[in-house]
């Protein structure tokens, strides 16, 4: 079992007292690895510290022929102080060592997970011609009446489709299709932008890996973004077909029921429902509830079900 840890208060010893100092040898931000052979007594058997913590991670391959699991780590937190982790470099202009604009490739030896380590931190957003690490969206709006989109310096979520050797990355300011034939060296196949997306949050393949749904977490998951006057292509899903290793936009989808100004609502996590010969997606919308849509026809997604609760009575959300 692999667990992502990003919070600054997290401790190496899992203690409850937190960590208060700016730089501390007691802090843990990265991935924890557990042996869960005995489900009633999970045991931590490995841990890997990273410069930006671990917001999400993706198991890309393994066990390999040499008994290793390969994981992509996506950290979205601030870069650690170099007094805490010497190799961590923040946003220093012109410094190619920066921990920004990268993902981490982590190797976990099954025979001894305590030896797990970062083997590389590829600059997956770099401009292939200039070498600039900030090679994709630089942040800001796209013109009049468009969304203000975050700079692409991190991936929030990378989803893999192992049999096709591809991955889809929701990477703050862009959606990316990766070639992972060599899992140690992911390569960009295509990059897309959306003038209505604020923050590319998650990516989900359909059953056969021919489509990708990207979600936009406009407002950071803490604001009302499903009001009657909010654009239907802001804080929504974007559906793409994969054609010749390129992402071709087909449509947007957003839950159809307007929510109140007090209801925290925006596209959040979702999952494919494995129905043969159909593409069906269940989507969470925080206090907006959940929706199920059929996107078998990528250009015309159909509402199948909507569950929404009264935020005044139920503040749990989905």
Put a short name on every predicted segment:
Residues 1-318:
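Feature marking well-ordered beta-strand scaffolds used for ligand recognition
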């Amino acid at each position: 079992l692999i667990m992502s840890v990003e919070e600054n208060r997290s401790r190496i010893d899992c203690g409850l007292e937190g960590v208060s100092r700016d730089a501390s040898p007691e802090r843990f931000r990265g991935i924890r690895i557990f042996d869960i052979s005995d489900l009633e007594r999970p045991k931590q058997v490995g841990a890997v510290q990273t410069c930006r913590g671990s917001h999400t991670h993706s198991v890309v391959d393994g066990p390999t022929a040499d008994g290793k699991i390969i994981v992509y780590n996506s950290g979205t937190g601030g870069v650690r102080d170099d007094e805490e982790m010497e190799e961590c470099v923040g946003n220093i202009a012109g410094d190619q060592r920066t921990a920004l604009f990268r993902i981490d490739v982590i190797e976990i030896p099954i025979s001894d997970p305590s030896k797990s380590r970062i083997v590389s931190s590829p600059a997956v957003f770099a401009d292939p011609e200039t070498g600039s690490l900030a090679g994709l969206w630089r942040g800001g709006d796209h013109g009049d009446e468009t969304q203000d989109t975050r700079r692409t310096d991190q991936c929030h979520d990378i989803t893999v489709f192992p049999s096709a050797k591809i991955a889809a990355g929701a990477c703050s300011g862009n959606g990316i299709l990766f070639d992972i034939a060599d899992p140690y060296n992911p390569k960009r196949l295509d990059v897309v932008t959306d003038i209505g997306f604020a923050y590319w949050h998650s990516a989900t393949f359909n059953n056969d890996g021919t489509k990708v749904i990207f979600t936009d977490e406009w407002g950071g998951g803490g604001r009302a973004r499903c009001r009657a006057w909010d654009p239907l292509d802001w804080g929504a899903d974007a559906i793409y077909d994969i054609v010749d290793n390129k992402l071709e936009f087909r449509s947007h989808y957003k839950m159809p029921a307007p929510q109140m100004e007090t209801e925290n609502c925006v596209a959040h996590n979702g999952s494919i429902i494995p129905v043969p010969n159909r593409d069906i997606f269940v989507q969470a919308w925080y206090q907006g509830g959940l929706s199920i849509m059929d996107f078998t026809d990528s250009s015309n997604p159909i509402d199948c079900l909507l569950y929404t609760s009264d935020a005044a009575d139920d503040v749990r959300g989905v």
